[in-house]
């Protein structure tokens, strides 16, 4: 018997997020990446969460803090509110609600996440860590100024 994927796609984990988590393949859409990141939090796979954050931000992420949060959180559901697959040629947005419990208290996290495609691979742009100055090069490596690239969508 196989287990359903925690991302609530309705597919078995082995046919859904597991190939992403094991880097056998990459998500083809920002929604797939967002679902796989949610699933990674459920499974406490913080390395995947970090590796799927835009490379320019990975060093700023506090792995211990993320791991502690994952350990203290019981994820109870995911709802995709909206997927905007083509905000630009390389950007996409996904709005979602993630339902969870901390200390038996039910909570909801709503987020409108930005994703960027670099060399054919989707990454999450984390707006909770320090972002470049608007006049500096974009953290995605596009060569554009931040304000004319990822910054325009945050």
Curated annotation (Swiss-Prot):
Pfam families the record matches: SEC-C, YchJ_M-like
InterPro entries for this protein: NTF2-like_dom_sf, SEC_C_motif, UPF0225, YchJ-like_M
Gene3D superfamilies (alphabetical): 3.10.450.50
Family: Belongs to the UPF0225 family.
PANTHER family noted in UniProt: ADENYLATE CYCLASE-ASSOCIATED CAP C-TERMINAL DOMAIN-CONTAINING PROTEIN (PTHR33747:SF1), UPF0225 PROTEIN SCO1677 (PTHR33747)
Name of the protein in its database record: UPF0225 protein Asuc_0343
Source species of the chain: Actinobacillus succinogenes (strain ATCC 55618 / DSM 22257 / CCUG 43843 / 130Z)
């Amino acid at each position: 018997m196989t287990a359903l994927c925690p991302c609530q796609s309705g597919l078995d984990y082995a046919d859904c997020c597991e190939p992403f988590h094991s880097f056998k393949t990459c998500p083809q859409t920002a929604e797939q990446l967002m679902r796989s990141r949610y699933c990674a939090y459920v499974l406490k796979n913080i390395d995947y969460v970090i590796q799927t954050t835009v490379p320019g931000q990975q060093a700023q992420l506090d792995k211990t803090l993320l791991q502690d949060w994952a350990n203290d959180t019981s994820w109870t559901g995911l709802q995709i509110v909206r997927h905007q697959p083509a905000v630009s040629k390389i950007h996409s947005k996904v709005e979602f609600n993630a339902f969870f419990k901390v200390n038996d208290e039910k909570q909801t996290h709503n987020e409108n996440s930005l994703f960027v495609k670099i060399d054919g691979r989707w990454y999450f742009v984390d707006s909770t860590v320090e972002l470049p100055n608007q006049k500096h090069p974009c953290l995605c490596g596009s060569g554009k100024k931040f304000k004319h690239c990822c910054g325009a969508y945050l």
